[in-house]
Regions:
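N-terminal leader/linker segments that precede catalytic domains of diphosphate-processing enzymes
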Residues: 1-165, 173-189, 193-249, 257-311
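Short aromatic/basic micro-patch
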Residues: 254
Length: 311
């Protein structure tokens, strides 16, 4: 398997240009106050038949109709469009087969819920989505060989995205109406069978990572993502063991950090999980300015400024 570098891992997931890209249409709020997402010209054309989205081909904008001045009205409008588009062959893979019956919240202005949309539909309109990623680990002074170890699951072979790849110990999207902490507790049990009392007493907030991913390459849909990061320290290697509670993972392996580094550089981790692991390794001193000449770019690109309002 081809060996990569830490900066390549970051560039792969934070792949969208840092310059303004005139290729995309801008999804604008009903009062014109903010840009909420970037949409490809191909997808933008499907809005021509939607009376509640005003398309301006010259300005390359898609503006939510001014009369949709409440979150309830906007929710209803996007729900109607998403449901209708499920039947369009062009969206059969991304929308129909990817339908999750889970709502993601878009914010505008910052901190204020503006609209809730189907998770699968969010990918089509390039809005920010949110999640939590949790690094389960045994610190060196508590491990059997004096080396830091991480609990690493392998994604189920039946997963529609990145089947069989390595993942973070726990990860999940921030679906309405759950908050960040509620999602941490919920996902820890659902994905790894970890009880709430254990999580409450062992997990700590470790920051946030932000990036804009192009899952299908350049000039296609974009995925701006914000992931809240938590470190979950285990007391030892045996007392509490994560296991695949909901079948999202095939198994969990307690890997020595040297093996994690090796598999990370062999591109065995799901792309955004590779970034989260890299961030963990930076924070715990396994990637340093002395060990990697691209250290500054690695750290800064794990924390990209977003062009849209945020949570």
């Amino acid at each position: 398997m081809t060996q990569t570098s830490y900066i390549d891992i970051i560039r792969k997931i934070d792949s969208f240009t840092y310059e303004e890209d005139e290729f995309y249409y801008k999804l604008k709020a009903h009062d014109g106050s903010a840009t909420l997402g970037y949409i490809t010209p191909t997808i933008s054309k499907y809005f021509e038949d939607e009376q509640d989205i005003l398309l301006d081909a010259e300005k390359k904008t898609l503006t939510i109709s001014p009369y949709l001045d409440t979150i309830e009205k906007r929710n209803a409008m996007f729900s109607l469009i998403a449901t209708k588009w499920r039947k369009i062959p062009y969206f059969s893979e991304s929308l129909d087969k990817g339908w999750r019956n889970e709502l993601y919240t878009v914010y505008n202005p910052t901190h204020t819920p503006y609209v809730q949309i189907e998770r699968a539909f969010s990918v089509l309109i390039g809005v920010i989505t949110y999640g939590v990623h949790i690094n389960g680990y045994v610190p060196p002074h508590k491990s059997s060989n004096g080396s830091l170890k991480m609990w690493v699951p392998r994604r189920s072979a039946t997963k529609p995205t990145y089947p069989g790849m390595l993942d973070n110990t726990v990860a999940g999207g921030l679906g309405y109406p759950y908050g960040i902490w509620e999602t941490v507790i919920k996902e820890c049990y659902e994905e790894a069978g970890l009880e709430e009392d254990f999580v409450n007493s062992h997990v700590r907030s470790a920051g946030v990572v932000l990036y804009i991913f192009e899952p299908n390459g350049q000039k296609d849909t974009i995925q701006p993502e914000v992931e809240y990061i938590y470190d979950l320290e285990f007391d030892n290697e045996t007392d509490v063991l994560p296991y695949p509670e909901d079948g999202e993972a095939e198994d969990f392996t307690l890997m020595d950090v040297s093996e994690v580094l090796d598999r990370l550089l062999k591109n065995e981790f799901k792309p955004n999980c590779g970034l989260v692991v890299t961030d963990f390794l930076v924070r715990h001193g396994y990637i340093t300015p002395e060990s990697d000449k691209n250290y500054l770019e690695i750290v800064s690109r794990c924390h990209r400024m977003m062009p849209f309002p945020t949570i």
